[in-house]
């Protein structure tokens, strides 16, 4: 009886901790629906890694409002990362199935099926650990984002916090880093190239003339006309 009582106390304690953590995440999402996040979990992790080698290391990032971001870049990102962004409620099960089949065929992870909302959930709150708990938490956060925020707000935050190169985060910093212009002035071709870099931004920052990057840029250009933006 003694052990049973303590088991339930410990169990309920862990349930309470999980509930409090979920509530904290939810409150952050509600707050960020009205106020811009100054950083993200991924940005902080990246900065800590950089400062292990250089204590003065800093990230290059500058917030730019949604209406000032080039429509070309919005279309390019949706065409490249989440063609059904406006249609789904956080998860594109067709893309997940396609990625699973392709990875199974190749015998290794070569394609992801994450939506923009899922990617934002990871960027804002989670570590890079690939565990069942992390995937479950990602799903919960994705649902919260979709319920609290509009698609426009999700895309706005996404474009401002994702990594786009070595110490480069967000569309404005990326446009200035690669082209010396504001994200408001990015052309179709420049937007497609920036979108093509998203899966491996640090690699493409150092290898900007790889044939695969050029090929992927052309593929994205071909899809942009059919991409719908919020």
UniProtKB/Swiss-Prot annotation:
Pathway: Cell wall biogenesis; peptidoglycan biosynthesis. Its EC number is 2.4.99.28. The keyword rRNA processing does not apply. The keyword Transmembrane applies. Keywords: Cell inner membrane, Cell membrane, Cell shape, Cell wall biogenesis/degradation, Glycosyltransferase, Membrane, Peptidoglycan synthesis, Transferase, Transmembrane, Transmembrane helix. One of its GO terms (biological process) is regulation of cell shape. Belongs to the glycosyltransferase 51 family. NCBIfam families: mono_pep_trsgly. Peptidoglycan polymerase that catalyzes glycan chain elongation from lipid-linked precursors. PANTHER family: BIOSYNTHETIC PEPTIDOGLYCAN TRANSGLYCOSYLASE, MONOFUNCTIONAL BIOSYNTHETIC PEPTIDOGLYCAN TRANSGLYCOSYLASE. This is Biosynthetic peptidoglycan transglycosylase. It comes from Nitrosospira multiformis (strain ATCC 25196 / NCIMB 11849 / C 71).
